[in-house]
Amino acid sequence: MRKPSYWNKAKSILSKKDKVMKRLINSYKDGALVTRNDVFYSLCKSIIGQQISVAAANSVFSKFEKSCRGKISAKNVNKLSSQTLKRCGLSKQKVRGIKDLAKKTISKEFKPYLINKMNDEEAIGYLSNLRQIGRWS
């Protein structure tokens, strides 16, 4: 995992716009968001975390990751039954969303690498075509 390429620019902009953020940024100079550069993983985590507490999301995600044998990928998720995903603590809608994401990734209907070439609105529109993913995902 590494710091996102936009991190330093974002800190600078936030520091100029908000005094509280400036103090926090200066207090935590070593702190940073990290990226895995894995869109599939991140979208699964986003779907799992929707409308539940952080503690619940962490618990469900841990079970989900174990079901994937430690490697969350479209191929591994696609092999899992809906029942296995439900046993992880996922709702029927979240199971459908994650299975849909896996299938569209495998079939290349969803191409994660395109997102980096899009502006924010284009990326939001593209991602919103996926079940369980919207503007705030």
Could you say what each language-model-derived stretch is?
Residues 1-4, 37-40, 75-78, 118:
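Short acidic alpha-helix initiation/capping motifs at coil-to-helix transition points
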Residues 52-53, 57-131:
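Alpha-helical ds-nucleic-acid-binding substructure associated with the helix-hairpin-helix region
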Residues 33-41, 89-93:
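Structural motif
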Residues 1-38:
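Intrinsically disordered, low-complexity, charged terminal extensions of DNA damage-control enzymes
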